[in-house]
């Protein structure tokens, strides 16, 4: 996947991404934070439960980091139009609007991230690609 989220010719992937459907139920993920030099700074596992509500979906996340830190977050995701979604959570520092294009779901936002014992305002550029009905690859670029 290119930095802008384009699939580099992978247009054959036809799994339409609907966040309100994909995030419903129980989810698991693993990931890591890598600095701009390619050094892994932090690893995590994430478990989440998505609960369908009248206004969209509520996603209850728990992050377990390799340094023993645990972080809980609740996202509220609601549809704004056919291909636009809005996300809300307590640590947002800006609007969070996402767009779906086929199997791609992308959104960007400013966020207060807990890092090394303090809260740091960062910018997330998030791109998710739905590969199969139950598999998504997520690339989140985090910058200050």
Regions found by a protein language model. Give the residues of each.
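Residues located in well-ordered beta-strands
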Residues: 26-28, 97, 127
